[in-house]
Amino acid sequence: MDLKGLTAVELGKKIQAKEVTVKEAVEACFAQIDKVEKEVNSFVSLQKEAALKRAEEVQKLIDDGTLSGPLAGVPVAIKDNMCTEGVTTTCSSKILSNFVPTFSAEAVLNLEKAGAVVIGKTNMDEFAMGSTTETSYYGETKNPWNLEHVPGGSSGGSCAAVAALEVPYALGSDTGGSIRQPSSYCGIVGIKPTYGTVSRYGLIAYGSSLDQIGPVARDVTDCATVLETIASHDVKDSTSVERQDTDFTSALVNDVKGMKIGIPKDYFGEGLDEEVKKPILEAAEVLKNAGAEIEEFDLELVKYAIPAYYVIASAEASSNLSRFDGVKYGYRTKDYEELHQMYKKTRSEGFGPEVKRRIMLGSFVLSSGYYDAYYLKALRTKALIKKAFDSAFAKYDMILAPAAPTTAPKLGASLSDPIKMYLGDIYTISVNLAGLPGISIPVGRDAKGLPVGMQLIGDCFQEKKLFQAAYTYECLTEKKWVSMYDKTEAAGKEEA
């Protein structure tokens, strides 16, 4: 039986029905990893021995009847900025290359309680700072659809692993689009939940007021199932929200009749590639024909989202990353005489260029002479953006938008021009600033065969509406754009 094309829920059903053992499921993942990993580079580390041992333990619990559920025995990959007890957690940075946590992130623990088997830690942009997964200390990850293109970022390793069929689903984190944009580039489904839905305990912080953990998978059902599993109130995270409505799978209903969907004119103007715009508007038409009410509207303030985001995120990063100094854990330079030299050389040698750029920017905007002019102004802009969304959601159930302005760029195209890379998040970062949920689903391909993703944005705690609309689209198109075959066999270089 070919297991690699199964979704997480499909695989879970076969494990429960005793058609497949947990060991067979894990071995199928590693067989595919052996086949494609050298080309794709989705993982920073693999835990084959530990995963096979865990598979035996989970199988025993399933056989005893003490463990059931849709994810029991199903393999998962974890983005390498989430702590995993006893397993190196690097944030794809040299400075944490030898860091082994003594505890696991709450989201990881929730998956393990549900019987998930962690097979490895995925590659990412260093400290989640980037949109291409090219800033990793462990080398760039490539897009399985075409190995000359990026998978997006910063959760590019998780998204590439799912797209390359190395694992049925994975966890990512989203600070400014880091789940939705790479999901779009890789032709998979990814959701950033409402801020506070998933505990940030054990997630190594980038921008604490923006970070949120979420799942990436091959279809909407998997995403809803995983989010239902990892969403929980956690006293260890002061921003965690106690929700009673996390039965997300109950929203998987093929029906959008009467749903009001707003399309922001500002998102479909200059800067949006025609090959991205066309399939998204066609997808909107599919929902309209199914009974949804589609209407254009103005969401003008979002044009200020990028400057506001990079001021706020960089300010929080400069504070969060000050703890990495070589004293208690992580990389420490060997060549120093004085303590201040050790700090300086450790951080200079341990951080990559993009991380240094954002730390410097953050330190600048927080400095006494510029705090009011930049940081305070950015916070006010953030509040105004939230107000603009509140006005929109007074009229609409959700907003339909692109997840990215283009399909996946070529490797190296954004590295030499950081501003170009930052603009790749133009449609996603306002969602983080407002703390809203957003889902990306595949809706087409461009002329090169690269995936196009559509983003649905909801009001706070309205993930169910997003899942319902996304699931309906999937049903109406019979998962036409979902990769359910081994595309990596055909992936390769474009002809000259």
Where are these regions (language model features)?
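Short helix-loop capping/hinge segments that flank enzyme active sites or metal/cofactor-binding pockets
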Residues: 71-91, 250-262, 315-386, 437-453
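Short alpha-helical scaffolding segments that buttress acidic/His motifs in well-ordered protein cores
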Residues: 25-29, 308-309, 355-363
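An N-terminal boundary/leader segment
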Residues: 1-53, 289-291, 364, 482-496
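Conserved hydrophobic/aromatic pocket- or pore-lining residues that grip, position, or stack substrates
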Residues: 29, 51, 79, 111, ...
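Short glycine/serine-rich loop/turn segments
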Residues: 71-213, 264-266, 315, 401-419
